Protein backbone atom coordinates (compact mmCIF):
# COMPACT_ATOMS: atom_id res chain seq x y z
CA UNK A 1 0.00 0.00 0.00
CA UNK A 2 2.80 2.35 0.85
CA UNK A 3 4.53 1.60 -2.46
CA UNK A 4 1.32 2.30 -4.40
CA UNK A 5 0.88 5.65 -2.67
CA UNK A 6 4.51 6.56 -3.41
CA UNK A 7 4.14 5.72 -7.11
CA UNK A 8 0.89 7.68 -7.34
CA UNK A 9 2.47 10.82 -5.88
CA UNK A 10 5.50 10.64 -8.23
CA UNK A 11 3.24 10.05 -11.25
CA UNK A 12 1.03 13.00 -10.32
CA UNK A 13 4.06 15.29 -9.90
CA UNK A 14 5.48 14.33 -13.32
CA UNK A 15 2.10 14.83 -14.98
CA UNK A 16 1.79 18.31 -13.46
CA UNK A 17 5.31 19.26 -14.56
CA UNK A 18 4.70 18.17 -18.15
CA UNK A 19 1.41 20.10 -18.25
CA UNK A 20 3.11 23.26 -16.99
CA UNK A 21 5.86 23.06 -19.62
CA UNK A 22 3.29 22.62 -22.39
CA UNK A 23 1.33 25.64 -21.19
CA UNK A 24 4.40 27.89 -21.11
CA UNK A 25 5.63 26.87 -24.59
CA UNK A 26 4.21 29.35 -27.30
CA UNK A 27 2.35 27.76 -30.12
CA UNK A 28 3.75 28.06 -33.69
CA UNK A 29 0.75 30.23 -34.67
CA UNK A 30 1.27 32.67 -31.83
CA UNK A 31 5.03 32.83 -32.46
CA UNK A 32 4.42 33.62 -36.13
CA UNK A 33 1.80 36.20 -35.20
CA UNK A 34 4.14 37.91 -32.80
CA UNK A 35 6.84 38.19 -35.47
CA UNK A 36 9.59 38.75 -32.91
CA UNK A 37 8.18 42.14 -31.89
CA UNK A 38 6.24 41.02 -28.77
CA UNK A 39 7.59 42.30 -25.53
CA UNK A 40 5.43 41.46 -22.54
CA UNK A 41 8.24 41.31 -19.98
CA UNK A 42 10.98 43.43 -21.58
CA UNK A 43 13.33 45.67 -19.63
CA UNK A 44 11.20 48.63 -20.71
CA UNK A 45 8.35 47.43 -18.51
CA UNK A 46 5.82 44.69 -18.39
CA UNK A 47 2.97 46.68 -19.91
CA UNK A 48 3.94 45.80 -23.53
CA UNK A 49 4.72 49.41 -24.58
CA UNK A 50 7.09 49.93 -27.60
CA UNK A 51 10.48 51.75 -27.51
CA UNK A 52 10.56 55.63 -27.86
CA UNK A 53 11.26 56.98 -31.43
CA UNK A 54 14.81 58.28 -32.12
CA UNK A 55 15.41 62.00 -31.45
CA UNK A 56 16.27 64.06 -34.59
CA UNK A 57 19.10 66.57 -33.90
CA UNK A 58 18.28 70.24 -34.71
CA UNK A 59 19.54 71.78 -37.96
CA UNK A 60 22.56 74.02 -37.38
CA UNK A 61 23.95 76.78 -39.59
CA UNK A 62 22.54 80.04 -38.22
CA UNK A 63 26.06 81.41 -37.66
CA UNK A 64 27.06 80.58 -41.24
CA UNK A 65 23.90 82.26 -42.53
CA UNK A 66 24.68 85.39 -40.52
CA UNK A 67 28.25 85.31 -41.80
CA UNK A 68 27.01 85.35 -45.38
CA UNK A 69 25.82 88.92 -44.79
CA UNK A 70 29.47 89.99 -44.71
CA UNK A 71 29.87 88.60 -48.22
CA UNK A 72 26.83 90.60 -49.33
CA UNK A 73 28.52 93.74 -48.02
CA UNK A 74 31.61 92.96 -50.12
CA UNK A 75 29.47 92.44 -53.21
CA UNK A 76 27.85 95.82 -52.75
CA UNK A 77 31.23 97.55 -52.31
CA UNK A 78 32.52 95.93 -55.50
CA UNK A 79 29.39 97.09 -57.31
CA UNK A 80 30.14 100.72 -56.40
CA UNK A 81 33.72 100.48 -57.67
CA UNK A 82 32.83 98.69 -60.92
CA UNK A 83 30.11 101.26 -61.60
CA UNK A 84 32.69 104.02 -61.25
CA UNK A 85 35.25 102.26 -63.49
CA UNK A 86 32.66 101.87 -66.26
CA UNK A 87 31.56 105.47 -65.82
CA UNK A 88 35.08 106.85 -66.27
CA UNK A 89 35.12 105.45 -69.82
CA UNK A 90 32.37 107.97 -70.58
CA UNK A 91 34.68 110.72 -69.29
CA UNK A 92 37.54 109.82 -71.63
CA UNK A 93 39.81 108.01 -69.19
CA UNK A 94 41.57 106.32 -72.14
CA UNK A 95 42.04 109.51 -74.14
CA UNK A 96 44.51 112.35 -73.94
CA UNK A 97 43.78 115.30 -71.69
CA UNK A 98 43.78 117.92 -74.45
CA UNK A 99 42.40 117.15 -77.90
CA UNK A 100 39.90 118.39 -80.46
CA UNK A 101 36.13 117.97 -80.25
CA UNK A 102 35.08 114.36 -80.78
CA UNK A 103 32.23 111.86 -80.45
CA UNK A 104 32.74 108.12 -79.93
CA UNK A 105 30.28 105.20 -80.07
CA UNK A 106 31.49 102.06 -78.32
CA UNK A 107 30.65 98.57 -77.14
CA UNK A 108 32.46 96.45 -74.57
CA UNK A 109 32.60 92.93 -73.18
CA UNK A 110 33.69 91.49 -69.83
CA UNK A 111 30.87 93.66 -68.69
CA UNK A 112 28.44 94.21 -71.52
CA UNK A 113 28.23 97.92 -72.28
CA UNK A 114 27.15 100.04 -75.22
CA UNK A 115 27.04 103.81 -75.40
CA UNK A 116 28.27 107.08 -76.75
CA UNK A 117 30.53 109.78 -75.30
CA UNK A 118 32.51 112.78 -76.38
CA UNK A 119 33.88 116.20 -75.61
CA UNK A 120 33.04 119.74 -76.72
CA UNK A 121 35.25 122.80 -76.37
CA UNK A 122 33.21 125.60 -74.80
CA UNK A 123 36.06 128.11 -74.66
CA UNK A 124 39.79 127.80 -75.47
CA UNK A 125 40.28 126.70 -71.85
CA UNK A 126 37.00 125.01 -70.88
CA UNK A 127 35.64 121.72 -72.26
CA UNK A 128 32.56 119.63 -71.56
CA UNK A 129 32.98 115.83 -71.24
CA UNK A 130 29.81 113.72 -71.31
CA UNK A 131 28.42 110.30 -72.18
CA UNK A 132 25.61 107.80 -71.69
CA UNK A 133 25.64 103.99 -71.79
CA UNK A 134 23.60 100.90 -71.03
CA UNK A 135 25.49 98.20 -69.17
CA UNK A 136 25.27 94.79 -67.52
CA UNK A 137 28.02 93.46 -65.26
CA UNK A 138 28.68 90.88 -62.55
CA UNK A 139 31.43 89.99 -60.13
CA UNK A 140 31.80 87.84 -57.01
CA UNK A 141 28.18 86.71 -56.69
CA UNK A 142 26.16 89.76 -57.77
CA UNK A 143 24.67 90.48 -61.19
CA UNK A 144 23.61 93.93 -62.38
CA UNK A 145 21.18 92.91 -65.10
CA UNK A 146 20.19 96.38 -66.30
CA UNK A 147 21.87 99.72 -65.63
CA UNK A 148 21.82 102.96 -67.62
CA UNK A 149 24.83 105.14 -66.76
CA UNK A 150 25.31 108.83 -67.43
CA UNK A 151 28.37 111.00 -66.80
CA UNK A 152 29.46 114.56 -67.40
CA UNK A 153 32.32 116.80 -66.30
CA UNK A 154 33.92 120.17 -66.94
CA UNK A 155 37.65 120.41 -67.62
CA UNK A 156 39.61 123.63 -67.32
CA UNK A 157 42.94 123.46 -69.14
CA UNK A 158 45.34 126.41 -68.85
CA UNK A 159 46.32 126.25 -72.53
CA UNK A 160 47.69 129.80 -72.49
CA UNK A 161 50.43 128.64 -70.11
CA UNK A 162 52.22 126.73 -72.84
CA UNK A 163 52.97 123.01 -73.32
CA UNK A 164 53.45 122.34 -69.58
CA UNK A 165 50.48 123.46 -67.52
CA UNK A 166 47.86 122.51 -64.89
CA UNK A 167 44.31 121.32 -65.51
CA UNK A 168 41.26 120.69 -63.33
CA UNK A 169 38.14 118.49 -63.64
CA UNK A 170 34.88 118.42 -61.73
CA UNK A 171 32.11 116.00 -62.60
CA UNK A 172 29.66 113.27 -61.72
CA UNK A 173 28.59 109.73 -62.64
CA UNK A 174 25.04 108.57 -62.02
CA UNK A 175 22.81 105.55 -62.53
CA UNK A 176 19.33 106.26 -61.10
CA UNK A 177 17.81 102.83 -61.75
CA UNK A 178 19.56 99.46 -61.71
CA UNK A 179 18.17 95.94 -61.51
CA UNK A 180 20.48 93.77 -59.46
CA UNK A 181 20.64 90.26 -58.06
CA UNK A 182 22.76 89.37 -54.99
CA UNK A 183 23.77 85.80 -54.10
CA UNK A 184 23.88 84.62 -50.49
CA UNK A 185 25.46 81.25 -49.65
CA UNK A 186 25.87 79.45 -46.34
CA UNK A 187 26.32 75.94 -44.91
CA UNK A 188 23.98 73.94 -42.64
CA UNK A 189 24.31 70.53 -40.98
CA UNK A 190 22.12 69.16 -43.79
CA UNK A 191 24.09 70.70 -46.66
CA UNK A 192 24.86 74.00 -48.43
CA UNK A 193 22.27 76.67 -49.26
CA UNK A 194 22.47 79.29 -52.01
CA UNK A 195 19.77 81.90 -52.74
CA UNK A 196 19.62 84.89 -55.10
CA UNK A 197 17.78 88.00 -53.90
CA UNK A 198 16.35 90.33 -56.55
CA UNK A 199 16.11 94.07 -55.94
CA UNK A 200 17.00 97.49 -57.38
CA UNK A 201 19.71 100.03 -56.63
CA UNK A 202 20.85 103.56 -57.45
CA UNK A 203 24.48 104.68 -57.87
CA UNK A 204 25.91 108.19 -57.75
CA UNK A 205 29.42 109.59 -57.68
CA UNK A 206 31.02 113.04 -57.64
CA UNK A 207 34.68 113.86 -58.12
CA UNK A 208 37.29 116.53 -58.46
CA UNK A 209 40.62 116.14 -60.23
CA UNK A 210 43.75 118.27 -60.27
CA UNK A 211 46.64 117.47 -62.56
CA UNK A 212 49.54 118.60 -64.69
CA UNK A 213 49.83 118.05 -68.43
CA UNK A 214 53.00 118.26 -70.54
CA UNK A 215 53.09 118.12 -74.34
CA UNK A 216 56.67 116.91 -74.48
CA UNK A 217 56.57 116.59 -78.28
CA UNK A 218 54.05 116.91 -81.11
CA UNK A 219 53.51 113.14 -80.78
CA UNK A 220 53.54 112.76 -77.00
CA UNK A 221 51.41 113.95 -74.11
CA UNK A 222 51.98 112.91 -70.50
CA UNK A 223 49.91 113.84 -67.46
CA UNK A 224 49.78 113.17 -63.73
CA UNK A 225 46.84 113.87 -61.45
CA UNK A 226 45.14 113.38 -58.11
CA UNK A 227 41.41 112.56 -57.94
CA UNK A 228 39.04 112.69 -54.96
CA UNK A 229 35.73 110.79 -55.21
CA UNK A 230 32.65 110.31 -53.09
CA UNK A 231 30.33 107.42 -54.00
CA UNK A 232 26.80 106.60 -52.83
CA UNK A 233 24.78 103.47 -53.52
CA UNK A 234 21.19 103.02 -52.33
CA UNK A 235 19.82 99.46 -52.34
CA UNK A 236 16.12 98.75 -51.93
CA UNK A 237 15.17 96.24 -49.22
CA UNK A 238 14.26 92.66 -50.11
CA UNK A 239 13.86 89.16 -48.64
CA UNK A 240 15.23 85.77 -49.64
CA UNK A 241 13.05 84.11 -52.28
CA UNK A 242 11.01 81.05 -51.34
CA UNK A 243 13.07 77.93 -52.08
CA UNK A 244 12.87 74.25 -51.10
CA UNK A 245 15.51 74.48 -48.35
CA UNK A 246 16.53 77.72 -46.64
CA UNK A 247 16.12 77.22 -42.87
CA UNK A 248 17.93 80.43 -41.92
CA UNK A 249 16.44 82.94 -44.34
CA UNK A 250 17.26 86.66 -44.27
CA UNK A 251 15.52 89.97 -44.81
CA UNK A 252 17.61 92.93 -46.02
CA UNK A 253 16.51 96.46 -45.12
CA UNK A 254 16.76 99.43 -47.47
CA UNK A 255 20.11 101.15 -46.96
CA UNK A 256 22.77 103.42 -48.47
CA UNK A 257 26.42 102.43 -48.91
CA UNK A 258 29.05 105.18 -48.98
CA UNK A 259 32.76 105.42 -49.64
CA UNK A 260 35.42 108.03 -50.37
CA UNK A 261 38.37 107.49 -52.71
CA UNK A 262 41.69 109.12 -53.48
CA UNK A 263 43.43 108.14 -56.71
CA UNK A 264 46.97 109.10 -57.71
CA UNK A 265 47.61 108.32 -61.35
CA UNK A 266 49.17 109.17 -64.64
CA UNK A 267 48.85 108.60 -68.38
CA UNK A 268 50.81 108.73 -71.62
CA UNK A 269 49.47 109.19 -75.15
CA UNK A 270 51.70 108.64 -78.19
CA UNK A 271 51.23 108.78 -81.96
CA UNK A 272 53.01 105.92 -83.76
CA UNK A 273 53.86 106.71 -87.39
CA UNK A 274 51.02 108.84 -88.73
CA UNK A 275 47.96 106.67 -88.14
CA UNK A 276 48.23 104.68 -84.87
CA UNK A 277 47.42 106.24 -81.49
CA UNK A 278 48.34 104.60 -78.20
CA UNK A 279 47.37 105.43 -74.62
CA UNK A 280 48.21 103.81 -71.31
CA UNK A 281 46.93 105.00 -67.94
CA UNK A 282 46.82 103.76 -64.37
CA UNK A 283 46.89 104.68 -60.73
CA UNK A 284 46.73 103.65 -57.10
CA UNK A 285 43.39 104.02 -55.31
CA UNK A 286 42.77 104.22 -51.56
CA UNK A 287 39.31 104.20 -49.99
CA UNK A 288 38.50 105.73 -46.62
CA UNK A 289 35.48 106.41 -44.38
CA UNK A 290 33.64 103.41 -45.83
CA UNK A 291 30.10 102.83 -44.60
CA UNK A 292 27.88 99.86 -45.40
CA UNK A 293 24.16 100.55 -45.24
CA UNK A 294 23.38 96.83 -45.21
CA UNK A 295 21.32 95.71 -42.18
CA UNK A 296 19.89 92.18 -42.20
CA UNK A 297 17.59 90.13 -40.00
CA UNK A 298 18.55 86.44 -40.12
CA UNK A 299 16.42 83.60 -38.76
CA UNK A 300 18.19 81.92 -35.85
CA UNK A 301 20.38 84.92 -35.02
CA UNK A 302 19.87 87.37 -32.20
CA UNK A 303 19.15 90.92 -33.35
CA UNK A 304 20.32 92.29 -36.70
CA UNK A 305 23.52 91.70 -38.67
CA UNK A 306 25.50 94.59 -40.20
CA UNK A 307 28.85 94.06 -41.99
CA UNK A 308 31.85 96.34 -41.63
CA UNK A 309 33.94 97.21 -44.69
CA UNK A 310 37.38 98.49 -43.77
CA UNK A 311 39.55 100.80 -45.85
CA UNK A 312 40.59 99.21 -49.15
CA UNK A 313 43.34 99.81 -51.70
CA UNK A 314 43.89 98.60 -55.27
CA UNK A 315 45.30 99.54 -58.66
CA UNK A 316 43.37 100.66 -61.72
CA UNK A 317 44.66 100.44 -65.27
CA UNK A 318 43.56 101.21 -68.80
CA UNK A 319 44.75 101.49 -72.34
CA UNK A 320 43.67 102.27 -75.88
CA UNK A 321 44.97 101.54 -79.35
CA UNK A 322 43.46 103.67 -82.11
CA UNK A 323 43.77 103.32 -85.87
CA UNK A 324 43.14 106.40 -88.00
CA UNK A 325 41.13 104.82 -90.80
CA UNK A 326 40.20 108.05 -92.59
CA UNK A 327 40.49 111.77 -92.06
CA UNK A 328 38.81 112.49 -88.71
CA UNK A 329 37.79 108.83 -88.14
CA UNK A 330 39.49 106.53 -85.60
CA UNK A 331 38.73 102.89 -84.74
CA UNK A 332 39.59 102.20 -81.08
CA UNK A 333 40.36 99.07 -79.09
CA UNK A 334 40.38 99.71 -75.33
CA UNK A 335 40.64 97.93 -71.98
CA UNK A 336 40.10 98.95 -68.33
CA UNK A 337 40.27 97.05 -65.08
CA UNK A 338 41.27 96.74 -61.44
CA UNK A 339 43.94 94.70 -59.66
CA UNK A 340 44.01 94.05 -55.94
CA UNK A 341 42.59 92.02 -53.06
CA UNK A 342 38.92 91.41 -52.49
CA UNK A 343 36.38 92.92 -52.29
CA UNK A 344 37.59 94.88 -55.35
CA UNK A 345 39.65 92.04 -56.80
CA UNK A 346 40.95 91.60 -60.34
CA UNK A 347 38.52 92.73 -63.04
CA UNK A 348 38.85 93.50 -66.73
CA UNK A 349 36.54 95.22 -69.22
CA UNK A 350 37.41 95.59 -72.89
CA UNK A 351 35.71 96.91 -75.98
CA UNK A 352 35.84 98.60 -79.36
CA UNK A 353 34.78 102.07 -80.45
CA UNK A 354 34.45 104.27 -83.49
CA UNK A 355 35.43 107.90 -82.91
CA UNK A 356 35.02 110.94 -85.11
CA UNK A 357 36.98 114.15 -84.54
CA UNK A 358 35.59 117.42 -85.83
Q: What are the roles of these predicted feature ranges?
A:
Residues 1-64:
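Cleavable N-terminal export/targeting peptides
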Residues 57-214, 336, 342-343, 347-355:
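Outer membrane beta-barrel translocator domains of Type V secretion systems
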Residues 168-171, 224-228, 280-282:
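Extended hydrophobic secondary-structure segments that form protein cores and membrane-embedded regions
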Residues 37-42, 161-163, 216-217:
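Short, aromatic- and cysteine-enriched interfacial helices/patches
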Residues 204-216, 223-231, 241-242, 267, ...:
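Outer-membrane beta-barrel porins/channels
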Residues 92-110, 149-151, 155, 251-358:
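Outer membrane beta-barrel transmembrane domains
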Residues 106-107, 132, 136-145, 176-204, ...:
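Extracellular/periplasm-exposed beta-strand and loop segments of Gram-negative cell-envelope proteins
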Residues 124-130, 159-168, 219-222, 274-278, ...:
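Repeated loop/turn-to-beta-strand initiation elements of outer-membrane beta-barrel proteins
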Amino acid sequence: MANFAHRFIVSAALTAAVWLVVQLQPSPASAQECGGDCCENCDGGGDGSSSAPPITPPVTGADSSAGSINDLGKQRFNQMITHRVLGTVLLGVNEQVNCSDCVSAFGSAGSFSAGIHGRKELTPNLSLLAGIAYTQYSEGGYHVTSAPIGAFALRYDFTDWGPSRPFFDIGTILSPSENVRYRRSYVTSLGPVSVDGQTSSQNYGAYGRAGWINRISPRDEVAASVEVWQLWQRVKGYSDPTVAFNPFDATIATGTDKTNLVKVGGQWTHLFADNVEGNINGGFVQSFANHSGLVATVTGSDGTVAPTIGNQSWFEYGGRLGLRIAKGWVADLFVNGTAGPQPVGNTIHGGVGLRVNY
